[in-house]
Amino acid sequence: MKLQPLADRILVKRLAEETKTKGGIIIPDTAKEKPAEGEIVAVGPGRNAEDGTKIALEVKVGDRVLFGKYSGTEVKIEGEEYLIMREDDVLGIVQ
Amino acid sequence: MKLQPLADRILVKRLAEETKTKGGIIIPDTAKEKPAEGEIVAVGPGRNAEDGTKIALEVKVGDRVLFGKYSGTEVKIEGEEYLIMREDDVLGIVQ
Amino acid sequence: MKLQPLADRILVKRLAEETKTKGGIIIPDTAKEKPAEGEIVAVGPGRNAEDGTKIALEVKVGDRVLFGKYSGTEVKIEGEEYLIMREDDVLGIVQ
Amino acid sequence: MKLQPLADRILVKRLAEETKTKGGIIIPDTAKEKPAEGEIVAVGPGRNAEDGTKIALEVKVGDRVLFGKYSGTEVKIEGEEYLIMREDDVLGIVQ
Amino acid sequence: MKLQPLADRILVKRLAEETKTKGGIIIPDTAKEKPAEGEIVAVGPGRNAEDGTKIALEVKVGDRVLFGKYSGTEVKIEGEEYLIMREDDVLGIVQ
Amino acid sequence: MKLQPLADRILVKRLAEETKTKGGIIIPDTAKEKPAEGEIVAVGPGRNAEDGTKIALEVKVGDRVLFGKYSGTEVKIEGEEYLIMREDDVLGIVQ
Amino acid sequence: MKLQPLADRILVKRLAEETKTKGGIIIPDTAKEKPAEGEIVAVGPGRNAEDGTKIALEVKVGDRVLFGKYSGTEVKIEGEEYLIMREDDVLGIVQ
């Protein structure tokens, strides 16, 4: 069982933000909004352009991404917590 | 008797949100807005693009979908409660 | 004598909302905004697309439609009350 | 001497709203915004589309129209009061 | 020496608004925003459409125009006061 | 050393606004926002249209321009103060 | 390890703003929002136009840029602080 996001939405598994992540990104502890890190587990088919064509996403399943701390909507699937957000909420891909 | 939604609207039968649903999705009990689950019972013919063509919906009758808890407008048809919402209010399809 | 709506506007005769309507739709009595039911008595020629072409309406004279309770502007024609609204205010067609 | 409206604007002579008009439209006396009735005395050449072409108006000089009570800007020409408004402020044509 | 307006801007010499103007327009003294009258002394080359082409102005130097009382920005050139405004602020041309 | 503005931005050297400028423009002393005068010292390559083409600027280096008093962002280059603003902030070219 | 920005975003290493920078730009100490200076260390593939094509960025890795003081989102990569922002936040390139 899985969840298929619509349009330009993606399903993200948030990574623990208390520790230094595998990717080596350390989230600074300041007053500004801080980005969070996660792994993409499902992607939508893409955004609909005005002329009806699909614009494919730049991100893909397996990408580790940074996104705004308060981006997306939380959902639990088979006991695991995920986030559904739009691709535009993704700041960058960790490589 | 039924209700035919216009444009990119869909008619959704909300599923009980107190229990673990058949699809296995458990809605987490947090302060953030939580998505609800439902089954699509009717879909509109699609959104009108700027050039007048129809952009068909991605969802179809029978799809089980997640949507924002406060999305849509309530309506009763022959004693049953439904929600009319836009396809864009749908976060993803449960598979 | 009649009133010809402009562009994507329609003229609607509101149906009594206190009782169960002929179409079998019962409006639930909740705190949320509730849709109202009416019959279309006149339609405009359609919305102007950016390139100047007309986009014809999906609804037609005689359709029974649901719309937001506070949609439209009231007007009296020969003693009868009507509502002028945009097609986008219509949630669905009762069939 | 006259006033030539620009783009999609029209010049309207408001009709007395206290009495039942010639067209038979009676404005209901409720708390909602009520439309007013007038006759078009001049029309602009049309709105400019994004590609520079003109989109001709649907209304023409002589049409009796309904419009929002607070639509338009008042102006006096040779002692007579008129309203300048956009065609989109017109709700419908009285026939 | 003169001022060349950019894009769809025009330079207007405001006419005295206390007296009945040559054009015969009398500004009514009500609480609503009242239009003012002026003569166009310079026009821009036109607005840039999305595809980069110019959309020429409808008004030209010498036109007497009505515009919203608070439209535009005041500027003095060689001791004379003018207004710089966008063509869209013009309500109509006095003929 | 210089600063190359991006897109439709320009770099402007503000002229003293206390005295009558060379161009003969006297800024009136009223409560309304008053335009300021400056000389363009650098221009960007132009705005990106929706289809990816560049829309060249109407102004060029050396033009004396009027702009809104609070337009732009201040920056110091080698001890001299400049303003970076968008071309749309320019009201007109002094000739 | 690095961070690949999405779409029209860029990754910027902020330069110390207390001293006169190498590029010779001195940030004035006024009440207005002051621009900051930085060096671009990574750029996204470009913004998606409405028709699905990419619009390449004007800036490139190595460019020294000015940007609004509060632009972008802070992130730490391997102990170093960076800013992720959109290209539109860049005011100009220091040359």
UniProtKB/Swiss-Prot annotation, chains A, B, C, D, E, F, G:
Alphabetized CDD domains for the sequence: cpn10
Pfam families: Cpn10 (PF00166)
Taxonomy of the source species: Bacteria, Pseudomonadati, Thermodesulfobacteriota, Desulfobacteria, Desulfobacterales
NCBIfam families linked to this entry: PRK00364.1-2, PRK00364.1-5, PRK00364.2-2, PRK00364.2-4, PRK00364.2-5
Classification via SMART domains: Cpn10 (SM00883)
Organism for this UniProt entry: Desulfatibacillum aliphaticivorans
Domain of life: Bacteria
Cellular compartments annotated: Cytoplasm
Subunit structure: Heptamer of 7 subunits arranged in a ring. Interacts with the chaperonin GroEL.
Protein's name in the database: Co-chaperonin GroES
Record's keyword terms, sorted: Chaperone, Cytoplasm
Protein family: Belongs to the GroES chaperonin family.
Alphabetical list of PANTHER family matching this protein: 10 KDA HEAT SHOCK PROTEIN, CO-CHAPERONIN GROES
